[in-house]
Structure formats: structure tokens, C-alpha cells
């Protein structure tokens, strides 16, 4: 537990949880408010991410074992960047473009599903000594949910704090949310890169 790599990985996972729960908690609201979707359509689009997350989780081990000889760092980088790209599609393409937003959720869900296994699980086990693997998983797990909690608070502040009333309608400025969510995903990739060559001391 004194290994800095475990704590760095915990930060990376926490930042990934920021983007995960940002979309899960606020995605429907964002699509309705910023892009003009109906509640039904917005909910359907976000649900695509959940389904693809299951697929990403199911195949994460196969991806690393079959295509990367059991290494987790390269696929963590690839799917971390996929998460960033998905958020950019979701947040930065204005208006109602159903297939673009659906594609963003396919990419997002798949990426998050894989990253959940790698950042929040397998990489911690690979790095930690055998007699401390459970504790390492606990640290990463706690940090991840702290990240999720901070996300809800910060997103609420950023959304509520940049609301204005124009002609009797509530108008939201999501530019700060874009920076927060995409920035968290980018920083998650950065911190994951810092443990690229770290190996267990066993």
C-alpha cells in the first residue's frame, strides 16, 4: 500500500468515475436541455451506453489477453482515449443528431466497461504485491466512488451556477461542464500512463 503506483491508479480510476457518473446522472438532462431531445429519446440514447458497458466488461479480459499478451496498459490507453472521444462527440456536437449521439454512447459505454475492469480492477491486482492485492482493490474502489460523489456535487454547482432566465425560459451554459467532464477523462488517461511500466514487487 506504500506503492505510489496504487494511489496514482486510484486517482486515474476516480477521474474515470467522474465521466462515468456524469453521463449516467446528468446525461438525460443534458440531452433534453442542451440538445432539445424528448425525455424518451434522451433516456433511450443514454441506455445505449449502459448496454455497451456490459459488452465492454464482458470482453475486456479477452481483449487484453488475446490482442495484447495480457498487458493492460495499452488497452487502457486506447479505451481511455475512446472515452475522451465519446464525450467530445456527446458534448461538442450541437443539436439533435440521433445517430451521432447514439454512436457516442456506444463508444462511451464500451470504453467505460473496459476501463472499469482495467483501472478499477485488473491493473491494481497486477501492480500490487500478492499479499496486498485485496487492499489495493479497496483503495482504488474507495477513490473511485469518492470521484463519483465529487462529480455529482461539482456538476450540480456548475450547472446550477450558470443558469439564466431569458424570456421566462431557463437557459444553461454547459461550457464549464464540457471542460469538467472531458478534462476528467483526459486526466484519467494521463494518470494511467504514469503507471505504464510499473510491475508488482513480488
Which residues does each predicted region cover?
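Extracytoplasmic gate region of multi-pass secondary transporters
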Residues: 2-60, 116, 120-121, 148-155
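Paired intracellular helix-loop junctions of major facilitator superfamily
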Residues: 69, 123-133
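A membrane-interface helix-boundary motif in multi-pass transporters
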Residues: 71-74, 157-185
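Multi-pass alpha-helical transporter architecture, strongest
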Residues: 90-94, 174, 179-202
Amino acid at each position: 500500500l506504500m506503492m505510489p503506483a496504487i494511489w496514482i491508479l486510484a486517482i486515474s480510476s476516480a477521474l474515470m468515475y467522474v465521466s462515468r457518473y456524469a453521463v449516467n446522472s446528468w446525461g438525460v438532462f443534458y440531452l433534453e436541455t442542451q440538445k432539445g431531445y424528448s425525455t424518451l429519446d434522451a433516456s433511450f440514447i443514454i441506455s445505449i451506453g449502459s448496454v455497451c458497458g456490459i459488452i465492454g466488461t464482458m470482453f475486456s479480459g479477452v481483449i487484453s489477453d488475446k490482442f495484447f499478451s495480457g498487458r493492460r496498459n495499452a488497452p487502457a490507453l486506447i479505451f481511455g482515449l475512446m472515452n475522451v472521444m465519446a464525450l467530445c462527440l456527446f458534448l461538442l456536437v450541437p443539436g439533435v443528431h440521433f445517430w451521432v449521439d447514439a454512436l457516442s454512447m456506444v463508444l462511451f459505454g464500451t470504453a467505460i466497461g473496459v476501463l472499469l475492469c482495467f483501472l478499477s480492477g485488473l491493473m491494481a491486482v497486477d501492480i500490487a504485491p500478492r499479499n496486498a492485492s485485496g487492499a489495493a482493490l479497496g483503495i482504488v474502489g474507495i477513490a473511485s466512488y469518492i470521484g463519483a460523489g465529487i462529480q455529482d456535487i461539482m456538476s450540480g454547482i456548475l450547472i446550477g451556477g450558470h443558469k439564466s432566465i431569458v424570456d421566462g425560459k431557463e437557459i444553461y451554459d454547459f461550457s464549464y461542464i464540457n471542460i469538467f467532464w472531458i478534462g476528467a477523462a483526459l486526466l484519467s488517461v494521463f494518470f494511467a500512463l504514469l503507471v505504464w511500466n510499473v510491475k508488482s514487487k513480488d
